[in-house]
Regions:
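C-terminal helix-rich "cap/oligomerization" subdomain common to oxidoreductases
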Residues: 87, 159-200
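Predominantly a Rossmann-like dinucleotide-binding segment in NAD(P)-dependent oxidoreductases
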Residues: 1-73, 193
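Residue-level signal for the nucleotide or nucleotide-sugar donor/cofactor binding architecture
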Residues: 26, 151-154, 171
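Solvent-exposed beta-strand sheet faces enriched in polar/charged residues
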Residues: 48-50, 95, 199
Length: 200
């Protein structure tokens, strides 16, 4: 998920003791959660990551979402990327930024999945495949199911139902643990300057 100079430069976002991190924690958590869901929640085993602050240190740095200068005491990253290896052999590359020189106004959130039988893009719902016998390339757009509620609101309803009915959480804790372990791995890898193991 990438943004171009689009963030809220207040303490709750830019001070690590209050936020826990920058865009990795703020917006990366959402794209990572969705990606792992699309992948079937494989177990992460190692992470190589970078989490740095460069662009928001420049003189005159600003956010299109908030007036004024970026606070001088900002101590979280403005860009992070990670390479994740999973127990099943899958890999993942993630990039998140609040301030990247990227051709978007607002937010660019995309997921590309690549497998042996095809590739897919979210949110475009494109599916790409190849017939190796006939040497044909196929590009299809999948039908997107419409929702009665906005997806985030639907998540809240499902969680409330689970609590009211003493049922299991619709999102098992293990899935959230994988997300947090990967984000933590990106920060640990940045600090240690190497690939780190994810112990779960």
């Amino acid at each position: 998920m990438l943004r171009r100079n689009a963030f809220i430069p207040t303490a709750g976002f830019v001070k690590k003791e209050l936020s826990g991190g920058g865009p990795c924690i703020d917006i990366g958590v959402h794209v990572l959660d969705l990606t792992l869901w699309l992948m079937g929640h494989p177990k992460p085993v190692s992470v190589t990551g970078v989490a740095r602050r460069e662009l928001t240190k420049k003189p005159g740095a600003f956010s299109v979402w908030h007036p004024g200068a970026v606070p001088a005491d900002m101590d979280v990253e403005d860009f992070a990327s990670g390479f994740v290896r999973f127990e099943n052999g899958a890999t993942l590359v993630i990039e998140v930024s609040w301030a990247l020189h990227h051709d978007t106004m607002g937010e660019d959130m995309q997921i590309w999945l690549y497998g042996q039988d095809g590739g897919a893009n979210w949110p475009k719902a494109e599916f790409l495949s190849t017939n190796y016998e006939t040497r044909q390339l196929y590009n299809r757009t999948l039908k997107v199911t419409s929702y009665q509620l906005e997806p985030h609101a639907q998540e809240c309803v499902e969680f409330a139902r689970a609590v009211a009915n003493d049922a299991p959480s619709p999102v098992p804790a293990e899935q959230s643990l994988y997300v947090i372990a990967i984000l933590d791995g990106i920060y640990r890898s940045q600090r240690e300057g190497r690939e780190v193991t994810v112990d779960l």
